[in-house]
Amino acid sequence: MLWVVMDDLLYIGALGAPFGVRGQIRLHSISSHPEHLIRHLRTVFIGPKRVPHQVSRLYMHKPGLLIIQLQTITDRDAAADLRGEEVYIAAADAAPLAADEFFYHDVIGMQAVTDSGEDIGEVRDILETGAGEIVVITRRGRPDALVPMVRDFIVAIDVGERRLVIRPIAGLLD
């Protein structure tokens, strides 16, 4: 599941072009659970100032693309003014996480260690590539380590202990 958190708000996507003439807007969503948003979402926070807007309608147009109607946006011109703006929701409005899911912000800042207990460094970022996610680990006096986020390498993510356990293969951390 992909979510980016800022001050108890989760980034869920960006607004695109208007959809129709009555103020509906395309929402390019990164949510893994759009059906939860469609059923439960009532408020979104838009733009760098996180301006709250009440949602009057939200539905799936096609995978990854939702159509959103905001109560205060009633025409195509007003909808066009929001094109490109980032959309956030309150963390409490997100779908509950499954046992094997986590928020990216829970991982960033974790201590990375090998499965034998050797300290690697601190998780600085998670990059998304077309093939999957890459964990960026900052190491003292060495270049960052880039570790694919796959079960072969990431053997445990302990949110409570703030530890990411890696099973390195030869050359992975060199």
UniProtKB/Swiss-Prot annotation:
* Pfam families in alphabetical order: PRC (PF05239), RimM (PF01782)
Which UniProt key words apply to this protein? Chaperone, Cytoplasm, Ribosome biogenesis, rRNA processing
Tell me which domain of life the UniProt entry assigns to the organism this sequence originates from.
Bacteria
Q: Which GO terms describe its biological process?
A: maturation of SSU-rRNA
What GO molecular functions are on record for this protein? ribosome binding
SUPFAM superfamilies, A to Z: PRC-barrel domain, Translation proteins
Q: What is its main location?
A: cytoplasm
**Entry-linked InterPro entries:** PRC-brl_dom (IPR027275), PRC_barrel-like_sf (IPR011033), RimM (IPR011961), RimM_N (IPR002676), RimM_N_sf (IPR036976), Transl_B-barrel_sf (IPR009000)
Any idea where the PRC barrel domain is? 99-172
Where found in the cell? Cytoplasm
A Gene Ontology cellular component where this protein is annotated is: ribosome
Its subunit composition reads: Binds ribosomal protein uS19.
Protein task:
An accessory protein needed during the final step in the assembly of 30S ribosomal subunit, possibly for assembly of the head region. Essential for efficient processing of 16S rRNA. May be needed both before and after RbfA during the maturation of 16S rRNA. It has affinity for free ribosomal 30S subunits but not for 70S ribosomes.
What family classification does the UniProt entry report for this protein? Belongs to the RimM family.
Per the record, the domain comment is:
The PRC barrel domain binds ribosomal protein uS19.
Q: What is this protein called?
A: Ribosome maturation factor RimM
What organism is the protein native to?
Answer: Chloroflexus aurantiacus (strain ATCC 29366 / DSM 635 / J-10-fl)
